[in-house]
């Protein structure tokens, strides 16, 4: 069905570019030591390549776990990118991706993936760093103290933007001025400039 499609959409072209510039072998090599193998009982794990592609697609389109699961059913382009044929198999569910993201976070692999992609882009001359644009984005958090300890998260602080006060953190994002590609992301308390 997908191969008979005549018009290539913007999403198709975007995912083709992501396919071309992403060092998939390096990403798999970085994650493989921590990824579960199919040696035990129960359902065998979904292939690492497929989970990485699903994770990258989720990040590119800013989707939630449920959102990427739905997108796999809705979008031929994303299905083709991830490598799923719905006539033969079902898409991985949101919980599977959640567990994969937790695995990446637990072993600090998200930073390794980010650095591998940026290193690969720099090698290909796609990340020039002739100038950097830095912006800070507020990430709101609930100011509630209704948790187990009865305390606020010590990493969160108040910050004022205009006349409005916010509670949470800031993401300081560095972007290459020429290409627009993100090369640095640092999270700090909300009161850090």
Model-identified regions with their sequence ranges:
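Short, Lys/Arg-enriched N-terminal segment that forms or immediately precedes the first helix
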Residues: 32-43
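Alpha-helical support elements that line or immediately flank enzyme active sites
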Residues: 50-62
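Short N-terminal amphipathic alpha-helices
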Residues: 27-30, 44-46, 63-72
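Secondary-structure capping and boundary motifs in well-ordered enzyme cores
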Residues: 23, 43-48, 60, 88-92
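Polybasic low-complexity intrinsically disordered regions
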Residues: 49, 66, 70-73, 82-83, ...
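Charged, often Cys/His-bearing segments associated with DNA-binding zinc-finger transcription factors
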Residues: 1-25, 29
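Short, solvent-exposed alpha-helical "recognition" segments
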Residues: 78-80
């Amino acid at each position: 069905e997908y191969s008979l499609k005549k018009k290539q959409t913007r999403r198709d072209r975007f995912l083709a570019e992501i396919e071309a510039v992403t060092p998939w072998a390096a990403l798999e090599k970085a994650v493989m030591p921590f990824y579960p193998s199919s040696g035990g009982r129960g359902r065998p794990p979904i292939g690492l390549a497929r989970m990485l592609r699903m994770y990258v697609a989720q990040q590119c389109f800013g989707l939630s776990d449920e959102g990427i699961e739905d997108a796999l059913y809705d979008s031929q382009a994303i299905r083709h990118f991830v490598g799923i044929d719905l006539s033969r198999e079902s898409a991985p569910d949101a919980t599977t991706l959640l567990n994969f993201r937790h695995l990446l976070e637990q072993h600090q692999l998200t930073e390794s993936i980010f650095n591998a992609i940026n290193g690969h882009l720099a090698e290909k001359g796609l990340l020039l760093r002739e100038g950097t644009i830095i912006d800070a984005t507020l990430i709101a958090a609930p100011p509630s103290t209704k948790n187990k300890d009865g305390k606020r998260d010590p990493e969160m602080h108040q910050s004022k933007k205009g006349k409005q006060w916010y509670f949470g953190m800031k993401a300081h994002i560095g972007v290459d001025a020429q290409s627009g590609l993100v090369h640095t992301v640092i999270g700090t308390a909300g009161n850090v400039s």
